[in-house]
């Protein structure tokens, strides 16, 4: 008979008697919880916020001077004309956020570290607010179409995006669709953000080169979406582009900002040209906003230029910097996860306005003022939040969009 083997008490031996214990630090959030433009970190870009009521918000703009000039009274009188005055007409664009929590979890997860590592009701409310704010950030950079990516190729259920950076628009579990009408709906099961690929349950409708991908729930209203920076400052200017009822093609620079095609130029040369051309039109950009990839290229290219580090570190490690431009001024430089690649916005901060109906992010309340809603059909509680807003650039001529 074999000799007995010594047995030691170790963790596996007494695993049934060990408790699970969590600190009060809660769940660490690895989602995009930083907002460059407005809501979560106004220290970066403190956009003006204007609460309004009624069905629409109106802001007039003069984009052409009056006539009446001549070397004689006769010619001055003959050329007399009124100034060209239009008005932006802004209507609210709605974005809803809803999260459910079962009754048993609501009462089990109370935040007591001896039993649960988070307070379920507080977590769902706080996280819903952050998620909605991040979605607004994404929309403020958009073109109002609801499109979040296009197809480059498909292999099995893996979709390679035309622009790898668009992978930031996707989340595991997200429902996506192929058309404005939402004809085919599928779910995201995996995202490779470095490779720019998205794995889905089925690729029906998103299996051909250049097929558009929309987030379900936004596609049906894609023609009435938030008028974000891509819509306000288009880089393709071959046909009419209407923003807040104004056709920008009447005077592209005055009504859509200066477009600088800096393809082939170094990043520093590109931003310098963009800022200077905006100044030539009477503008005075205060901020440059770009993708983090373009920000990295600019910082590497600007090693020999005068650059300053200011402000607090961003969450992912980059710092806000200021860059010197030829007229001796300084312009802040910011990165955003949702800014389109190879596109830089030279913006005059005081001129951008976030018009919102109600508070910026509203909790939809019950009659008694509570914000948790109960559904006896499913035995769940839910929190419902709403944002009604849009972006207005009052005098686009003060800004520039730069294509790298």
Predicted regions and their residues:
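Core alpha/beta structural scaffold of self-assembling particle/tube/pore-forming proteins
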Residues: 1-70, 79-404
